[in-house]
């Protein structure tokens, strides 16, 4: 199921899927049915814990994996054509060099996993000013 006819978005999703090779692609549609399915999956892995319904109805505790949340300074880069644009306290790398490194890292990175596509609009849908992703 695809939730857009925007050829640029569809092309990008296809390119990322070809690169990362997920077992499945799920487009998030915002439905209650899909929300409940995702909650059930997350509770099954222990990521999501349903709290006491009497005291906190409809509430959950979500814990992120400790390996997913911290920024590692020595692996954080400002990518620009000119090194001086990164500033004196930042790591710098040429964008083309970084893209090459990242494509190597991402190649096959989603094997055995599900890719979730979450459509969004920055701005009113249909507006000349809206940006879609």
Give residue ranges: language-model regions.
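Conserved internal helical-beta-strand scaffold that buttresses enzyme catalytic cores
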Residues: 1-133
């Amino acid at each position: 199921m695809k939730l857009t006819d925007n050829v640029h978005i569809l092309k990008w999703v296809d390119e990322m899927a070809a690169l990362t090779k997920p077992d499945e692609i799920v487009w998030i549609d915002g439905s209650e049915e899909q929300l409940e399915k995702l909650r059930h999956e997350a509770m099954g892995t222990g990521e999501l814990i349903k709290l006491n319904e009497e005291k906190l109805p409809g509430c959950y505790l979500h814990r992120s994996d400790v390996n997913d949340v911290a920024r590692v300074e020595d692996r954080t880069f400002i990518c620009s054509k000119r090194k001086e644009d990164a500033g004196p306290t930042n790591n710098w790398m040429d964008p083309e060099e970084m893209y090459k490194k990242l494509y190597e890292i991402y190649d096959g990175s989603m094997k055995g996993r599900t890719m979730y596509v979450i459509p969004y609009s920055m701005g009113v849908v249909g507006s000349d000013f809206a940006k879609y992703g």
